[in-house]
A protein has these predicted regions:
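Sec-dependent bacterial lipoprotein signal peptides
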Residues: 1-19
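Extracytoplasmic metal-acquisition and chelation regions
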Residues: 17-298
Length: 298
């Protein structure tokens, strides 16, 4: 289970008030689908798949904060109240969004909860956007949902899907290159964000699972896992350390420093897109290029 996601109560109260006052529950008079994404990684994908036929608002997009701790606002409530389509990550990552949906019931609004699509639940690792196969699966589902919401433009959404498939090629190529060149290389990660991608890359993620999960949930990791992680670094069992730039703690900062002291490259990766103007695939490919460069030094 990820760390508790706090939600501002007045946001839900305002959402209920909006519904009572007759604000539209969903639908757009302009012919453009109003899409709300809980996080900007799903928002980037949704925008590319919808093109000029959608207007996408991503709620969580600040690269300087921990998305696990996001607090919803009155502005978020208004956005949810008028959305045609909402995309949430699920699995406890953005429970604030579920509460805003409950405060704004609508028969017109469609919802995609990625965790449900992938048969995942609260307590499972929620970093689904770090698994390449699941990106394609989510993209297929968003495309199908757009077609259902806007059947007259189904052919347009099919073309957008193919364009996005082509745009993902450098991302998939970077993954394939690392997998073919560095399969089995032992690496470490300060948090569970890298678990799915390590599997896709064929890397051997040897960090204590209980440590990574505790950091992801905002808890103090068991002392024995901290000692084990430190030993892995001081004995050079880890060739590269992956560091989550958005969930840093004194313990993870210490591990980052310990890696540097032992000449182990550190590669930072983030929960949300950085910079915020980048596309999903450019953000991911840049991180993969940095990882490949670090691996090449070992």
């Amino acid at each position: 289970m990820t760390r508790a996601i706090r939600s501002v109560l007045f946001g839900a109260m305002l959402a209920a008030g909006l519904a009572t006052c007759g604000a539209p529950a969903g639908g757009s008079t302009s012919g453009t689908l109003q899409v709300i994404a809980g996080e900007n990684f799903w928002g980037s994908i949704a925008a590319q798949l919808g093109g000029s036929h959608v207007a996408v608002t991503s709620i969580v997009n600040n690269p300087n904060t921990d998305p696990h701790e996001y607090e919803s606002s009155a502005t978020d409530a208004r956005a949810f109240a008028t959305a045609d389509y909402v995309i949430l990550n699920g699995a406890g990552y953005d429970d604030w969004g579920q509460r805003l949906l409950s405060g704004n019931p609508s028969q017109r609004r469609e919802l995609l909860t990625v965790a449900d699509l992938l048969n995942k639940k609260a307590g499972d690792n929620p970093h689904f956007w770090y698994k390449p196969d699941w990106i394609e699966r989510v993209a297929d589902r968003i495309t199908a949902d757009y077609k259902a919401l806007d059947a007259a433009d189904a052919a347009y959404y099919s073309r957008q899907r193919e364009t996005f498939r082509s745009a993902l090629k450098p991302y998939h190529d970077a993954i394939a290159h690392i997998r073919s060149t560095y399969s089995g290389v032992p690496v470490g990660s300060t948090e569970s964000i890298f678990v799915y991608e390590a599997q896709a890359l064929g890397l051997n993620l040897i960090s204590p699972p209980a440590f990574m999960q505790a950091i992801s949930e905002g808890n103090g990791p068991p002392a024995q896992t901290v000692a084990e992680f430190q030993d892995q670094l001081t004995h050079h069992q880890v060739k590269v350390l992956i560091y989550n730039t958005q969930t840093s703690t004194p313990i993870t900062d210490n591990l980052k420093q310990l890696a540097a002291q032992n000449n182990i490259p550190v590669v930072g990766i983030s929960e949300t897109i950085q910079p915020t103007t980048a596309s999903f695939q450019d953000w991911q490919t840049k991180q993969l290029d940095a990882l490949q460069a670090a691996l090449s030094r070992q």
